[in-house]
Amino acid sequence: MSRTAWRSYARPVPTIEQSDRINDVCIVKPDKYGDERGVFIETYRRSWFPLGREMVQANRAERQAGAVVGLHYHLHQADYWTVPRGRARVVLHDLRAGSPTDGATLCLDVDADNALGVFIPPGVAHGFASLTDLTISYLVDSYYNPSDELGVAWDDPAIAADWGLTDPVLSARDQANPRRADLGANVRPHANLRR
C-alpha cells in the first residue's frame, strides 16, 4: 500500500463503551490494522471522549512485575490510559459524592494484546498492578499540579479491589494514603466536577 493510500484509508470509530459500573468511565476497544509490516492501532482521538476534555500532556511509566501504583485521584484532571507493553490490572473506584455510582469499584485487565484504552474522569480513584513488566502511557487534560494529586488506600476494604497480586511492591507515598472513610471534606470529590 502506498504512503498516500495508507493515510487516506478510512478508519471506523472504535468501540467505545460507557462503563456500567462507574459513570463517565469509558473503555475504548480499538480496531487493529495489520499487514506484512506489523500492526497499526489508533489509540486516541479527542472526539471520542465526553466532558469536552482536551488532553495536553503525555506521560509514560515503566514498572516491574509485582508493583502496585495508586490509588490516586484528582479533583480536576482527567486521564486516558493505554498499556502498549505488558499487562496491567487497572483498578478504578468512584469517590464522587453525589454520583449514582459513588462507592463502585471496577477492575479490568489492559494489555498490549487487547489494546484497551481507559478514560478516567476527575474524582475517580485509579491505580494499577503490574501483572508483568509493563509500560503504561497516559494522557492528561491538565499539567501536573501537586495540589490536585491525591490518594486513597489501595487495600481499603471499603474499595474491595482484586489487584491480582499477593505481595505487591508500593511506594512509601502510596502506602501512606488514607482510607476512604478518612478523606476530609476538602479533598472528597463531588459529581459533576469541572475545572
Task: Give names to the regions the model predicted.
Residues 2-116, 135-138, 142-195:
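Non-catalytic, conserved peripheral segments adjacent to functional cores
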Residues 110-132:
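Conserved metal-binding segment of the jelly-roll/cupin
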